[in-house]
Amino acid sequence: MDMPREGDRSFEQLVEHSLEPAYVIDPLDDRILEANRAGCAMLGYTHEELLTTPVSQIHPAELPQMREFLDQVLRDGQGSTIKLTCRTKIGTFLPTEMSLHAFESDGRLRILGLVQDRSEHRQRDPED
């Protein structure tokens, strides 16, 4: 199933109103193109700040794993999940689980990332 196109109003509303943090990124330019309120709040950035923050700044400690994972998602085109840490605006690291899905918009590859904060799960389940 193809992902809806960027600019599709129902897709935009679904992402914006999701309770889970959601991001649309350009994997080739290391840019966050869009983020919903939950995504901004999780990382502590305003919407405008986040759109000017490189993806590599959010994942500095695991950049090689992140790039390899993005390559896999782009190659397979299907969703996949990975556990990575995200660096917040204030510099703390947050354990997360990300589900990434590739789609095309205006002839360019994009990634939709749905992210779960795993820190609360860790407190309840130290084995995770």
What is the predicted function of each stretch?
Residues 1-10, 116-128:
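PAS-associated C-terminal cap
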Residues 22-24:
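Short hydrophobic secondary-structure edge segments in sensory/regulatory modules of signaling proteins
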Residues 30-33:
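Conserved hydrophobic beta-strand signature of PAS-family and PAS-like sensory domains
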Residues 39-50, 61-63:
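PAS/PAS-like sensory domain cap-loop motif
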Residues 60-71:
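PAS/Per-ARNT-Sim sensory domains
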Residues 73, 85-91:
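PAS-family sensory domains
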Residues 83, 93-97, 110:
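Beta-strand residues that line the small-molecule/cofactor-binding core
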Residues 98-114:
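Short loop/turn elements at sensory-signaling interfaces that couple input to output
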